[in-house]
């Protein structure tokens, strides 16, 4: 039966007298939760695909974090909603009074990822009879947060896990952190180099750090030779090779013969000859390559590793004292839960399969050439840090479904042209026939004609609204549209999810609560910036909208998952929206199941202004002085009470985060002015008195 035949439309539904127009009832949201469950939400949002083994929908309809992966016991699961409540509730209620957006870090997840990677390689080495070891490094560019890097060095110390740096600040950071790590841990020095960079790397060896200078450009060798002789340090040198193996995805653009980094075979031969000529060929000990991030399959991985292993064996034959093959990055994660490897969003292998493919490829080539098995190193940043960090943000408002009412149609047909009336009659006839296709055709025709007449000035806005209301109702009744609502979120896409804007990278985005309720709308997410690109309208699974719930007075919170790598490092300050608040959460046995060990309010407006070379202190004094001058004009002698109120308001605005303060985060104003750093008994207790976070200056409102 045609869709329109199901609608009880009276004969006068489209007449000039709109008192009898049929208006469909609003959907009953109370029935949305019937026959729904967290398991259905888990399937809808693919949580079991991309989230395993760290995230799941619990029986309460909230996202649970499993901090120890598949080894997590039921009582160790952490309800993410409880963490958010602890972070954002006012201090008077036992909370930390932090403001959204909020990054929640789980060091336990980070530890599990690191140990899982190590275990995967150790298992492959043991089962395949490989006669060396795996010794990885974390590329700090993925996320340079101090506590993340310190955790990685601590967690990986027992198996010599090291760091990779690609710039002078990163090398300083890595050297400092590795002073507390294993003395055998690698400090792999990649990237473009000048004399200062090379000098820092050589200084690292003087400090008994295991630094390796990897040649990315042939001319870097002259610097290394000259400076090492000058400071009397015998360097350990690696070289990066440009392989022929290349993967076709976005992340493969840095690989292949035309890649940005690395040496060709001709350049490699020249490097070997020069090192031999100066008596330093024994310093060449590491071969590095990088196929590209998010390697989709083990077949491609094996091709690249096999090619590199052949180069490694050739360097051994040429007399280099080779010891390490560094396979670079590329260990991918499954952003969409499909495990297909058919796009940059997924990979078709597990950690264990990845490690097995690497070990098998190196072993096969080295055995063929009778070369001693090298130490295998990888730079697996994305796979290590992506899961441990969750970005939480709130939906502050949402567009409403427009329900057409008789008042919307009161000007329908008044003063319309004969052509518009003709279009209307055609639409009316199609509605009465239940002809869906003709209805859509005449709706479009009527709207276009009336828009043109409005532009010409022959229709008023009320008359145009009458046509719009009619057409919306008809389209809805025949099932011609499923309106997608816009949910406005307290977030900057450019700061917190820059890869979505820059390279169309998708991340799982899911409500962190109400998963026991059926979503009743589909929506896109619009951020706070004044930019048309500041929206999220593509989601995993090829969807252009996200199933969402109606907003209520209790807050609606969404989580972006698997964004622990790169997003924080790449974020910009478009519209001067700065960094989010951050909490660090450890699993603890007890009634709540977790402990917040560190909490930091996000960047204030003053912080962001200062980063752009403004002087917030001077700005504050200028505005305060202007207010005092105007006060004298309007009231002889001034109004000190009002002056103090204005100054206090300005001070709060400078010290507060740029994001909206709504719901539970309204206490952020107080927190932004007072004590901004929260420590548990695990960390050093500190409250710098009048000097907030990072030595924040205070404003005088006297």
UniProtKB/Swiss-Prot annotation:
GO terms (BP aspect): arginine catabolic process; putrescine biosynthetic process; spermidine biosynthetic process
Residues in coiled coil: none
Reaction it catalyzes: L-arginine + H(+) = agmatine + CO2
Essential cofactor(s): pyridoxal 5'-phosphate; Mg(2+)
Pfam families recorded: Orn_Arg_deC_N
Annotated substrate binding sites: 325-335
Chain segments annotated as transmembrane: none
CDD domains recorded: PLPDE_III_ADC
SUPFAM superfamilies, per database record: Alanine racemase C-terminal domain-like (SSF50621), PLP-binding barrel (SSF51419)
Family, per entry: Belongs to the Orn/Lys/Arg decarboxylase class-II family. SpeA subfamily.
Name of the molecule in the record: Arginine decarboxylase
UniProt source species: Brassica juncea (Indian mustard)
């Amino acid at each position: 039966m045609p869709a329109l035949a199901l609608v009880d439309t009276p004969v006068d539904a489209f007449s000039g007298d709109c008192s009898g127009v049929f208006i469909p009832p609003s959907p009953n949201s109370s029935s949305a939760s019937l026959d729904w469950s967290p398991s259905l939400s888990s399937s809808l949002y693919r949580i079991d695909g991309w989230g395993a083994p760290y995230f799941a929908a619990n029986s309460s309809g909230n996202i649970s974090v499993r901090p120890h992966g598949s080894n997590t016991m039921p009582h160790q699961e952490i309800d993410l909603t409880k963490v958010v409540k602890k972070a954002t509730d006012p201090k008077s209620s036992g909370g930390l009074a932090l403001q959204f957006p909020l990054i929640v870090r789980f060091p336990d997840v980070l530890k599990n990822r690191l140990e899982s990677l190590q275990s995967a390689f150790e298992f492959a080495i043991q089962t395949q009879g490989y006669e060396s070891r795996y010794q990885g490094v974390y590329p700090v560019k993925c996320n340079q947060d101090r506590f993340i890097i310190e955790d990685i060095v601590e967690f990986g110390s027992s198996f010599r896990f090291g760091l990779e740096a690609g710039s002078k600040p990163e090398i300083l950071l890595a050297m400092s952190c590795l002073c507390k790590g294993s003395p055998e841990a690698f400090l792999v020095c990649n990237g473009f180099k000048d004399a200062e960079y090379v000098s820092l790397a050589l200084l690292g060896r003087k400090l008994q750090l295991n630094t390796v200078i990897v040649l990315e450009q042939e001319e870097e060798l002259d610097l290394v030779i000259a400076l090492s002789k000058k400071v009397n340090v015998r360097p350990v040198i690696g070289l990066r090779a440009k392989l022929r193996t290349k993967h076709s995805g976005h992340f493969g653009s840095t690989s292949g013969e035309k890649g940005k980094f690395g040496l060709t075979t001709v350049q490699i031969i020249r490097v070997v000859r020069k090192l031999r000529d100066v008596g330093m060929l024994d310093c060449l000990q590491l071969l590095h390559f990088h196929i590209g991030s998010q390697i989709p399959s083990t077949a491609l991985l094996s091709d690249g590793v096999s090619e590199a292993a052949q180069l490694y064996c050739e360097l051994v034959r040429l007399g280099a004292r080779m010891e390490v093959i560094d396979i670079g990055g590329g260990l991918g994660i499954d952003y969409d839960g499909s495990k297909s490897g058919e796009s940059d969003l997924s990979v078709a292998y597990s950690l264990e399969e990845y490690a097995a493919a690497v070990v098998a490829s190196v072993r096969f080539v080295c055995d063929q050439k009778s070369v001693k098995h090298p130490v295998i190193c990888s730079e697996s940043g994305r796979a290590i840090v992506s899961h441990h960090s969750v970005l939480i943000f709130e939906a502050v408002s949402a567009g409403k479904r427009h329900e057409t009412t008789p008042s919307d149609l009161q000007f329908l047909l008044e003063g319309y042209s004969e052509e518009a009336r003709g279009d209307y009659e055609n639409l009316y006839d199609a509605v009465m026939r239940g002809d869906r296709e003709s209805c859509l055709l005449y709706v479009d025709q009527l709207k276009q004609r009336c828009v043109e007449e409005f532009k010409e000035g022959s229709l008023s806005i009320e008359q145009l609204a009458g046509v719009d209301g009619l057409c919306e109702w008809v389209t809805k009744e025949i099932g011609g549209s499923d309106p997608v609502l816009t949910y406005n979120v307290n977030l900057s896409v450019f700061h917190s999810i820059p890869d979505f804007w820059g390279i169309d990278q998708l991340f799982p985005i899911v409500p962190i609560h109400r998963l026991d309720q059926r979503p009743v709308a589909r929506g896109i997410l619009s951020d706070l910036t004044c930019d048309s690109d500041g929206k999220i309208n593509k989601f995993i699974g090829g969807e252009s909208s996200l199933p969402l719930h109606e907003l209520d007075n209790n807050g609606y919170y969404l989580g972006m998952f698997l964004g622990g790598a790169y997003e924080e490092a790449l974020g910009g300050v478009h519209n001067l929206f700065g960094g989010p608040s951050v909490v660090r959460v450890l699993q603890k046995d007890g009634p709540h199941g977790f402990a917040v060990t560190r909490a930091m309010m996000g960047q204030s407006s003053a912080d962001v202004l200062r980063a752009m070379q403004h002087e917030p202190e001077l700005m504050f004094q200028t505005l305060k002085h202007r207010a005092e001058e105007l006060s004298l004009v309007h009231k002889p002698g001034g109004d000190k009470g009002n002056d103090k109120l204005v100054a206090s308001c300005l001070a709060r605005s400078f010290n507060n985060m740029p994001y909206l303060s709504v719901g539970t985060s309204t206490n952020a104003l107080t927190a932004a002015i007072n004590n901004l750093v929260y420590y548990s008994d695990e960390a050093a207790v500190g409250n710098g008195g009048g000097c907030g976070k990072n030595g924040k200056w205070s404003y005088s409102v006297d």
